[in-house]
């Protein structure tokens, strides 16, 4: 029997855990002067945390009702476009980073959506989805709770194979290891919950298409240290001779 489509009511389920995992996975991406496109932003719950973490944001959503909710939640200046994940009205390499939220996307539509996301992404792509190869999913199926699962889902290895065919380095992480009936009990977010094993109910895959660049450089440490402030030109003689330069005698 086919599963019912996900309800927008379930988009906030386990939101702190999922947001913490997403921000942890996107942490290596540089922010300064870079733009992130969120495909399928839904009701916009994810937009404020991404904006607060330093990304310049753009977003798109198919549903008019969800677009209106996203506009109310989005930070000032964030554009919410009307676009389908499998056809984006953007030129190639229009955005540095792309986040494709496949939480409410039917599995059959994922290959076309990934193709479009990779087309408009210049440096990296992240994919979020509900994982059917997880203990919570199996528990939910055994108890027959077909009406309670928060979104469309697919096995982890299916999403991995689709992204592994693209050039770049692939990373994975997941959260929500407990049965779905325990997600409503508001747990504290710990680092242990952000597992790099892809067997939780909600997964994030990150594809880095370009080599990672360094961020703000650390201060250089000069050895031996100067005991007093001196002009930079004089330090070269100290480094080569090991002795401080002779002081000039003024008449």
Where does each model-flagged region fall?
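Conserved class I S-adenosyl-L-methionine
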Residues: 1-32, 45, 124-150
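Class I SAM-dependent methyltransferase SAM/SAH-binding core
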Residues: 37, 42-87
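A short acidic, Gly/Pro-enriched loop at the edge of an enzyme's catalytic core
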Residues: 86-97
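A short SAM/SAH-binding and catalytic strip from SAM-dependent methyltransferases
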Residues: 96-109
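A short glycine-rich, Lys/Arg-flanked "PGG" loop and its adjoining helix->strand segment in the class I
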Residues: 111-125
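Short alpha-helix
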Residues: 149-177
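A C-terminal cap/extension of S-adenosyl-L-methionine-dependent methyltransferases
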Residues: 171-251
């Amino acid at each position: 029997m086919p599963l019912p489509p996900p309800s927008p009511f379930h988009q906030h389920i386990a939101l702190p855990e999922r947001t913490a995992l997403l921000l942890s996975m996107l942490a290596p991406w540089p922010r300064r002067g870079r733009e992130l496109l969120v495909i399928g932003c839904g009701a916009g719950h994810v937009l404020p945390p991404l904006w607060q973490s330093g990304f310049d944001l753009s977003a798109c959503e198919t549903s008019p009702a969800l677009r209106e909710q996203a506009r109310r939640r989005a930070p000032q200046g964030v554009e919410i476009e009307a676009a389908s994940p499998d056809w984006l009205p953007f030129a190639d390499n229009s955005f540095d980073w792309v986040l494709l939220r496949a939480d409410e996307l039917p599995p059959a539509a994922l290959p076309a959506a990934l193709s479009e996301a990779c087309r408009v992404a210049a440096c990296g792509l992240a994919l979020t989805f509900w994982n059917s190869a997880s203990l919570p999913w199996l528990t939910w199926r055994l108890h027959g709770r077909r009406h309670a699962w928060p979104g469309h889902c697919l096995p982890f290895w299916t999403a991995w194979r689709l992204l592994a065919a693209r050039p770049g380095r692939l990373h994975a992480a997941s959260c929500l290891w407990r049965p779905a009936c325990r997600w409503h009990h508001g747990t504290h977010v710990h680092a242990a919950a952000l597992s790099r094993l892809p067997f939780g109910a909600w997964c994030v895959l990150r594809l880095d298409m370009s080599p990672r660049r360094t961020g703000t450089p650390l201060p250089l440490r000069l050895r031996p240290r100067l005991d007093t402030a001196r002009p930079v030109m004089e330090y070269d003689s100290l480094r080569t001779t090991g002795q401080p330069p002779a002081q000039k005698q003024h008449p």
